[in-house]
């Protein structure tokens, strides 16, 4: 079997259809059960998404002396909430938002070899019990979570168990009983991946130790100055009494991370730098976070989005779906992270697999997910915040990018601006800073040109696929089967707890005239089906359906 070369053909087709299709109506979403295996997770850098409160832009005396794209730029919690209220995420079919850490970051700056950098990204913690003033207040965070839940959107926090922030003149090193400051990791085996620092000047928590430790003096002094020392100590005493855990570094961290869940109703964690810690600690964290979410839901029944348990996804750098449940740390040591409390793994595969034909990718992913990984899932992406090899670095294939990401089996991670072709290269920036430009709201509003296309038209395509995906768990969670190669057509079928869902998708269709599409027995003759791409309906006849419109994609379901 030889599939047609869809990439170039669809690029031309989308170019011809974009302006017209942006105006086509889409059907209203139909309620179907949410499943994390089909989630569309919008991943954003809090500081780079939207500035909803300019009054917090100059926190802690941080200066405007950073290297290009390495300082704070104003994005905050209030900015995310504003976009939820506008309906931006709902229109895109997003049902979960993963935001970078908003806890208090180091106040100073450091240079890791790519220029002076501040902790705008959120991965350089100073105090795990407080929000960073540049990101917002607890009232603003509560409003964010409540607003998200009211709009059917879950909130995923990014958590770091591996390291503190770098040491700077303003930010002291944690005590030696808490962290190691060397050696630097060499990644040859488990020991040289875990018992080491990721880079120089990034103190590594002693997460493998069970030795009781006292609170770091700098936190004690800080909490006393802020008038909350007694409260924090009382809560810690209660935690250690309830759990029976030793007062070791990792258990303090677990308590602090779980507190955000218990207080605000956070729905899940994305775990950072997982392979650099002892695998077993994540199961312990999952237990505490699950208890915390259950407590919050009991206390806030009217605010609970559903009764699903706490969800955790793992970032094991360079994990690919083909690794399934066996990741090689080197030296003959393998780890099954899905046996350590995780429900899903971030897969680094699609950003390179997207260069392959659709059917090769879709069938391979489906086979693995419904075979070796049954009961778990992956979170696919085509670009991300620290991956220097995105699928489409120059944003020349925005429509194919959407198709490959949003139609691939598994959950989908939209990295902020994928849907608006946000640039991933900035003059003067070095390293991963290029991937972290500010969200291009101005280009979306003006419908600016991006190569052969316009930004608003690109987003309209992403939104059509996203809404279809959100309404149909079969897209990401269902079993894949090809129906035909010309045009490329496939079906996805899903069933869980007595609820079923079936869809048919066709890609690379002619934009000159309507095309008859085989539905592969998914829908019976005489059934009325809807194309979610155009909003048109048609009746199945002789196992095929023809919509009275010409669009490059058909997203077919019986609703």
Feature annotation, model-predicted:
Residues 24-25, 255-374, 378, 394-396, ...:
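Active-site-proximal helices and loops of the catalytic beta/alpha 8
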Residues 2-21:
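Gram-negative bacterial Sec-dependent N-terminal signal peptides
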Residues 27, 33-39, 47-259, 263-264, ...:
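Substrate-binding/active-site clefts of carbohydrate-active enzymes
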């Amino acid at each position: 079997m030889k599939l047609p070369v869809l990439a170039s053909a669809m690029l031309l087709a989308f170019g011809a259809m974009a302006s017209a299709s942006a105006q086509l109506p889409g059907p209203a979403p139909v309620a179907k059960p949410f499943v994390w295996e089909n989630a569309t997770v919008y991943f954003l850098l809090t500081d780079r998404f939207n500035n909803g409160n300019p009054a917090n832009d100059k926190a802690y005396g941080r200066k405007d002396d950073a290297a290009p794209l390495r300082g704070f730029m104003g994005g905050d919690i209030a900015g995310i909430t504003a976009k939820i209220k506008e309906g931006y995420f709902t229109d895109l079919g997003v049902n979960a938002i993963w935001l970078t850490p908003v806890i208090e970051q180091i106040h100073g700056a450091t240079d890791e070899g790519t220029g002076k950098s501040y902790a705008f990204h959120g991965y350089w913690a100073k105090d795990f019990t407080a929000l960073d003033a540049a990101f917002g207040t607890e009232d603003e965070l509560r409003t964010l979570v409540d607003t998200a839940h009211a709009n059917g959107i879950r909130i995923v926090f990014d958590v770091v168990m591996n390291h503190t922030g770098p040491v700077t003149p303003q930010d002291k090193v944690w005590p030696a009983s808490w962290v190691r400051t060397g050696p630097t990791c060499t990644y040859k085996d488990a020991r040289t991946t875990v018992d080491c620092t990721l880079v120089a000047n990034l103190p590594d928590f002693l997460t493998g130790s069970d030795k009781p430790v006292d609170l770091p003096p700098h936190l004690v002094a800080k909490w006393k100055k802020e008038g909350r020392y007694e409260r924090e100590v009382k809560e810690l005493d209660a935690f250690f009494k309830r759990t029976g855990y030793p007062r070791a570094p990792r258990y303090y961290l677990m308590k602090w991370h779980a507190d955000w869940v218990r207080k605000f109703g956070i729905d899940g964690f994305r775990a950072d730098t997982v392979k650099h810690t002892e695998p077993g600690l994540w199961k312990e964290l999952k237990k505490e976070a699950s208890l915390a979410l259950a407590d919050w839901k009991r206390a806030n029944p009217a605010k609970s989005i559903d009764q699903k348990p706490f969800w955790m996804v793992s970032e094991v750098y360079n994990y690919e779906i083909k690794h399934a449940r066996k990741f090689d740390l080197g030296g003959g040591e393998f780890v099954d992270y899905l046996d350590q409390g995780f429900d899903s793994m971030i897969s680094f595969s699609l950003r390179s697999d997207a260069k392959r034909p659709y059917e090769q990718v879709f069938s391979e992913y489906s086979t693995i997910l419904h075979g070796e990984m049954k009961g778990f899932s992956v979170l696919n992406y085509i670009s991300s915040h620290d991956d220097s090899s995105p699928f489409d670095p120059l944003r020349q294939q925005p429509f194919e990018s959407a198709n490959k990401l949003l139609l691939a089996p598994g959950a989908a991670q939209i990295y902020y601006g994928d849907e608006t072709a946000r640039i991933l290269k900035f003059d003067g920036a070095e390293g991963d800073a290029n991937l972290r430009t500010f969200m291009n709201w101005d280009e979306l509003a003006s419908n600016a040109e991006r190569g052969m296309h316009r930004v608003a038209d690109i987003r309209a395509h992403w939104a059509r696929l996203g809404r279809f995906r959100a309404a149909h768990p079969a897209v990401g969670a269902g079993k894949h089967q090809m129906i035909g190669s010309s045009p490329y057509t496939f079906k996805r079928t899903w069933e869980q707890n007595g609820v079923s869902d079936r869809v048919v998708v066709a890609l690379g269709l002619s934009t000159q005239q309507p095309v008859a599409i085989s539905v592969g027995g998914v829908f019976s003759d005489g059934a009325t089906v809807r194309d979610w791409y155009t909003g048109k309906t048609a009746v199945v006849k002789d196992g095929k359906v023809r919509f009275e419109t010409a669009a490059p994609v058909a997203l077919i379901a019986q609703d």
